């Protein structure tokens, strides 16, 4: 459909449409889309070279490179970039864009900021992303995941109060989505992730009430039928969240509450 409409698109949109053809090279479904990730990243590099001042293109290009080696950008032992990854190119592209945005007063770009956080959170120097985290924080108040993203850096730098506060804001935003769409969707994974982060931050702060409130609210919005959904296999991602109240009781030494807790037979019970 995009290719059919390409003639009426802008020049940059036409190059993006052409690049997508490298991302999805067959009309038939395949088991592993990663086989085309390199082709797509190479195509997006060409788009970027022609449009390096377009921050939408910056975000799409960086994402394409990062998805070649997801969660394998830095060697956790040496702290060096993984040799087969595009880590340093991502760093150069994103830091150039961020410097330009800060220098010319352009509108902060959530995609650029979001990806920089993901790039730096597994690096040996996550603190380099603290300003970017603050720039993304509250930038799009109704986007729960983006309210949350700054805390990927906060938690690594010991800013646990911000972890609790920003994930509380994310949970508030997510409630709007939940009230409209319910729990039976993949976004419930992202909602649970925000509750989990709030719980984690509260445990580091020694704050029992926000910790237990977070886990109770999370469990209340993860019904058993969601966990048992087979396609997509939601239990693969969500079942572990159901055990987190036990973790909270142990962390705070609430042994009587732990002994009194009912055995969880199914999620939400």
Predicted regions and their residues:
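Solenoid-repeat scaffolds in large eukaryotic assemblies
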Residues: 58, 90, 114, 129, ...
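Extended catalytic-interface subdomain
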Residues: 167-170, 188-222, 235-253
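Active-site-adjacent "gating/activation" loops or surface patches in catalytic cores
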Residues: 110
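Oxidative protein folding and maturation machinery
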Residues: 245-249, 255-265, 269
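Alpha-helix capping and inter-helical loop/turn segments
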Residues: 70, 124-127, 249-254
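TPR-repeat structural position
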Residues: 37, 87, 125-126, 160, ...
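Catalytic-core region of carbohydrate-active enzymes that cleave or remodel glycosidic bonds
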Residues: 152, 157-169
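Short coil/linker segments at helix-helix boundaries
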Residues: 1-53, 60-104, 113-123, 132-135, ...
């Amino acid at each position: 459909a995009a290719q059919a409409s390409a003639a009426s698109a802008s020049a940059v949109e036409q190059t993006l449409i052409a690049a997508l053809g490298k991302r999805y090279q067959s009309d038939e479904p395949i088991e592993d889309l990663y086989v085309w990730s390199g082709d797509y990243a190479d195509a997006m590099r060409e788009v970027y070279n022609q449009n390096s001042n377009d921050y939408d293109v910056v975000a799409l290009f960086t994402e394409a490179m990062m998805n070649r080696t997801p969660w394998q950008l830095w060697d956790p032992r040496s702290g060096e970039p993984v040799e087969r990854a595009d880590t340093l190119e991502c760093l150069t592209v994103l830091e150039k864009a961020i410097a330009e945005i800060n220098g010319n007063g352009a509108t902060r770009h959530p995609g650029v900021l979001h990806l920089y956080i993901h790039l730096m959170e597994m690096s040996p120097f996550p603190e380099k992303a603290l300003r970017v985290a603050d720039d993304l924080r509250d930038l799009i108040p109704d986007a729960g995941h983006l309210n949350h993203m700054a805390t990927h850096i906060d938690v690594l730098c010991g800013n646990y109060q911000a972890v609790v506060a920003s994930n509380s804001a994310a949970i508030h935003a997510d409630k709007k989505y939940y009230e409209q769409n319910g729990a039976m969707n993949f976004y419930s994974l992202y909602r649970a992730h925000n509750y989990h982060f709030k719980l984690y931050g509260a445990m580091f702060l020694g704050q029992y009430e926000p910790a237990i409130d977070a886990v109770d609210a999370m469990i209340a919005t993860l019904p058993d039928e969601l966990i048992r959904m087979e396609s997509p296999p939601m239990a693969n991602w969500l079942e572990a969240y159901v055990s987190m109240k036990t973790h909270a009781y142990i962390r705070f030494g609430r042994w009587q509450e732990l002994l009194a807790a009912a055995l969880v037979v199914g999620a939400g019970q």
